[in-house]
Design a protein with these regions (language model features):
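C-terminal binding/interaction regions
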Residues: 1, 5, 16-23, 65-161
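Generic alpha-helical structural element
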Residues: 2, 6, 42-45
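Positively charged, low-complexity intrinsically disordered leader regions
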Residues: 8-12
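Short beta-strand scaffold segments in enzyme catalytic cores
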Residues: 28-32
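Generic structural signal for well-ordered beta-strand positions
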Residues: 38-39
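A short, polar/charged loop-to-alpha-helix boundary motif
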Residues: 44-61
Length: 161
């Protein structure tokens, strides 16, 4: 962005991501759906991209925030395996979409939310960090236009300056 002389007002999604990231000192991605800005932040079990897409699916399907789309019966074994194999402690976006597809076989609300994913095609998003390749590829496959700050996460740690 600096090279192109672009600031946080260039896209509507940049400023909300930066503000939330600075406030909470965690990586954040924001995305504009229609006129609304949706954010996803890193949690103990989700990548920011995964959190963003779950929040977007809830918004598009009108699912309240307190309703979980991912079943604990699916999440727990996945997280346990990641821990055992030392492949991280958060689910990536591709892993979350896989878990959602499994949950959709027994939960029609999740199935409807998955069907609404096509509505995010062409949306603008901004990350406060350099998104890892797996999440970035999946966001690209979902046809989301992504910009990123030049901040790396090192060893799953994030220091936003």
């Amino acid at each position: 962005m600096n090279e192109l002389d672009i600031d946080e007002t260039f896209l509507d999604v940049i400023k909300p991501a930066l503000e939330k990231s600075r406030k909470e000192n965690i990586p954040v991605i924001s995305m504009k759906i229609g006129r609304k800005i949706i954010t996803g932040k890193q949690t103990n079990i989700l990548s920011p991209a995964g959190s963003l897409i779950l929040n977007a699916m809830k918004e598009l399907t009108k699912i309240p925030d307190d309703i979980d789309l991912l079943s604990p019966n699916i999440l727990e074994p996945m997280l346990n395996l990641k821990h055992e194999l030392k492949t991280g402690n958060r689910l990536t976006l591709p892993e979350i979409l896989t878990a959602l597809s499994i949950c959709s076989t027994t939960n029609p609300i999740v199935e409807k939310a998955i069907n609404n994913l096509k509505k995010i095609k062409g949306c603008e998003a901004h990350a406060t960090y350099i998104v890892d390749n797996g999440d970035k590829k999946t966001l690209k496959n979902l046809k989301i236009n992504l910009t990123c700050e030049p901040e790396y996460m090192v060893n799953d740690e994030y220091n936003f300056e």
